[in-house]
Amino acid sequence: QARVRLLLSTTGNTIQSVTGFLTVGCALRPMLHLTNLSPLDFGSILPGDAPGIFRVHANGQTSIAGGGGLRAFRSAPAPAVFLVTGTSGTEYCLELPQRILLRGPGGNLEVHSFEANVPLPGFLPKGGFTFQVGASLAVPAHQAPGLYEGIFQVAINYP
């Protein structure tokens, strides 16, 4: 309980004191921890004569849209892997980015359509869980060769 004190002045010169009690509460939520175990890796890609989209799905599969000769080359593309730990039964909500840019020797490459292989809102199971994040990479025609890198943020929030 907290004590509240209020001074009131009447029309005269008398000061009256009024004391009341009210309850103050606070809900402390258990901590949630998010750890990145491995990065989102598009692997090695050969750009084509036309723009294309290379997708690493959250389940680890890959796909290509748009054609133009875009293809993976001797690599093992993989989704990012994350670990969530905390008190079992805690409600959570994952937040993924809309889009990011990869920077390298040529023009920037856009990564978009991020997806996770778990429900974005959910309840933490006993022992926590791992989940994977995939996304699509837009590759322009004749993109300059080289290493392209960027950073994306995944947040775990309380709903």
Each predicted region: which residue ranges?
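Short acidic, flexible loop segments centered on an aromatic residue
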Residues: L94-L102
